[in-house]
Amino acid sequence: VKERRAIQNLANLTGNRQRNERHAGNHGFEWQKLRNIMKILLAAVNAKYIHSNLAVYSLKAYAQKKLGKNDSQEIEIAEYTINQTFDAILQDIYRKQPDLLGISCYLWNIEYVGHLLTELPKILPDMKIWLGGPEVSYDAKALLERFPKVEGVMCGEGEETFAELLRVYDEKKETFCAGEKRDEIFSGILGIAYRNKDGAVIQNAFRPVIDLSAVPFVYQHIEDFENRIIYYESSRGCPFSCSYCLSSIDKCLRFRETELVKKELQFFLDNKVPQVKFVDRTFNCRHDHAMEIWTYIHEHDNGITNFHFEVSADLLNEKEITLISRMRPGLIQLEIGVQSANEVTIREINRTMKIEILSTIVDKIKKGNNVHQHLDLIAGLPYEGYESFGKSFDRVYAMQPEQLQLGFLKVLKGSVMHEKAQEYGIVYQDRAPYEVLSTKWLTYGEIIRLKQIEEMVEVYYNSGQFCHTMAALEREFTSAFCMYESLAAYYDEINAFAVSHSRIGRYEILYDFLTETCKERAEEYVGRLTSDLYLRDNVKNRPAFLGENGVTSDEAAAFYKKEEKERTYLKSYEGYDRRQMRKMTHLERIDGKMILFDYKNRDPLTGNAAVYEVG
């Protein structure tokens, strides 16, 4: 009888889908309830669409491996972005009708997640909400007090904790429904914070770390990650104790088995994944581990996949540098945290970096012209004022990295910097990402100036679109920092920070700045601006300040007619006629010389066109 009723109910669901969706959320939800399935939703709110959240995929994969096949539970992953409308995410979660919702929390999404935590209980009052991630692990008590409808927080490493929670929810269904012995059950689960029957927040001890090799590979369905960055983990923990960083808290450094790593990297190579970003905090902290992986990707290079690593440059040895120098241009890119060149600051934040060694190694890698190097500085660190930061900037800028990122101190809960904030006189924002406003050594006014300089560096250096012009312009100033400081002041003066600008607009502002800063030599910069402009693209809307192209139509026609026959410069254009070659290249007369820009063949590091001087 029960079976017949269930079948009839299912038929009613199929025949009356609209009515069921209106009254119960959706058809799938009703079907699951009839089958007595607990639906678990792991939600990630990413900063951008191209990002993926490794954490939620690892939680799901580990739980399924640990618990085995379980017909009474279904785990689904939903990834959103902070750029989506709030209502769109709210509605999507409601339609999925989860019994248990787990949300991955970070600096960049915690404000957004906070709004979800306020509204979701109103529309899904019976849903259990669990949070996890670095943003909630070290301040669980305050968060649970702020959001009374949140069931609990998974603190620290989450795979084993999440699996145990699912086991408990599955085995103790009746107990949880009746509300009996809940405190007793939760008290035995390591790595969680929860609210007991009296409303008091209980923080259990952190859970011992797991064997990293036990975490399943999560990218079998690689098609789900098309056009997105793949994040990969070959180690967890960090051997260092930088006071501003949460990674220093996890002292249990462990590595995934190298043979397993190779097998998984080969999967990415076979599938020609564009980029794999290692999330290891210091990838090269163990030389044999780094060497084996770098050797493997070098020997199995598919000519397409790029691998991104965060490294300590001063730890690189000659053997590693030699191997790196032999790699295909663009095979790897290195992110190197310098943070400061002030030795007092470096010591105070517990870094072991030797700036002289770091500079030498960055230079050695630079000479290979095959690796994109991304160097970081942090403004707002102890004992680093405005003048000192300017010196740190000049020191790092002189290393000529492909990217120089100016960041601002984030005072993270759980970090040593958070504990010492009062001692350092650090004033920071209450809202995430808890960015510095001022310190004993740096005023808020100076922070504003540094933010303006940061934008100038981003536009005129990191874009790689003004390299010839900026290299020459630097000689007009006492230092690179002064140059960007002056350019920022000019932007401020003409109110250019208040509006957005096109690429051509940035060139025009820079030209105006040149005419004001070095009037007698401004015209000398036109050639450099022209070169920079056409290195990246065959610009159709030519800026007025460049004047007319010195190459006439007849000269261009004669060149391409000859090139079609002889292939003197465009050797890789076999099969292309002169009309096609003309579309894919550009001829320009710069400083009296005829220059050919080839957009089919670009530098793998900079993206700039190949350039030939036409004789």
Q: Locations of the language-model features?
A:
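Short N-terminal binding/cap micro-motifs at the start of the first secondary-structure element
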Residues: 49-55
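Radical SAM [4Fe-4S] cluster-binding motif and immediate context
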Residues: 1, 213-367
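Glycine-rich beta-alpha loop elements in corrinoid/cobalamin-binding modules
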Residues: 39, 55, 62-64, 74-206
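Radical SAM enzyme core and accessory elements
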Residues: 5, 9, 17-25, 31-43, ...
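Proline-aspartate-enriched helix->loop->beta-strand connector
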Residues: 97-101, 273, 401-402
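A structural motif corresponding to the C-terminal lobe/cap of the Radical SAM core domain
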Residues: 45, 287, 299-302, 306-315, ...
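N-terminal [4Fe-4S]-dependent radical SAM core
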Residues: 38-40, 186-234, 606-611
